[in-house]
Amino acid sequence: MNIKKLLIISFILVGCVAVSMAENPKNFYNPVTSGVPSLTISPDARAGGMGDVGAATEPDINSQYWNPAKYANIKSVAGVSLSYTPWLRKIVKDIDLAYLAGYYKIGDLQAVSMSLRYFSLGSIALTDNEGTPMGTGKPNEFSLDVAYSRQLSKYFSMAVAMRYIYSGLGIKDENYSPGHAFGADIAMYSGIPISLNTGVSMLGIGLNLSNISTKISYDKRNTEIFLPANMRLGVSYAIPFDAYNKLSINFDINKILVPAYPQSKNYEGGVTSEEYDAAKGKYEKMSSIAAIFYSFADAYDNPAYTRKEAFMDELREVNWSTGLEYSYNNQFFGRFGYSNESKWKGNRKFFTFGAGFKLTAFQLDVGYVLGLAPTTPLDQTLRFSLSFDVDGLKDLVDLGK
């Protein structure tokens, strides 16, 4: 079965860009990989224009992905948003991400929310081992999640989310079948108002543990793959300059909670090494929950590292992002951001730019990615989001009466 294109796409999605090993043989290229990597793609244009930050930014309709606990602090009674991203357009032309999110407030202290994510990898020509055409496959992935958030005190809220994940490789082979998995998120958010001479500023602190899930399999559970469990921690500070102008400064750190797969070259004897076989067996039999904790210390089991080098490798797995958002009269928005990943863990480094316009009930946002790595496939990525606010719709109806 020829699935070369599918493998190339999956390889790119986890950020695998070629890096020369001659620079430092100890600091070898060792990215953390997982199944269904589309779950880690930033879905909306607002956060996408601020360097992919969102754990502690001011609540919006697309908070479901970044931190659903923020919904308990949102002011409008309900809202819905639709986002679209043409993905990896520098590589292929038919990969797309669509994202639908919405929420509804129950009183002043709690909210329910949901999102639907659909990721299409386009069409792939399938052949058998002899190159005979076997039709066309259309790999796709989607997830559906619902969340409940509640304010537990004046300035603190929490949320839990449940998620169903589907991943179909589009392979016409009786040995392969679509993968299914279930996951959960746990999120916390604190929004603390601080009075200034120019108005009330807002300090936000957020934490989201996402995709705490079962493993996924495409071959009737003979092989099981971790999904990208993730920890995102962020801080945000929104400063009003006067009644019309405001600037928010945002910073996130992000760590995927999956251990790195053992590499045979780090073991004496390579693939024939008993130690390598034992390390592979440990990885493959590990539960998803155990893997979350092990992901903070897996480098210490790498025989190629000293303890200091193992510690540095763990630090390299922490990505960071920062972003700014300027708003005028809560109607016009300008955004800028930067996201950084170690060159040994994927080398995804990029600037982002964004703009938004809000008119009573509607808001349109656009985000753009400018890649910095020479061969990054993320360069020139565009995101679009269109949001509808229920309170704004009510205001429009009232004006028409």
Could you tell me what each predicted segment is?
Residues 23-401:
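Subset of outer-membrane beta-barrel
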Residues 1-25, 235:
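Bacterial Sec-dependent N-terminal signal peptides
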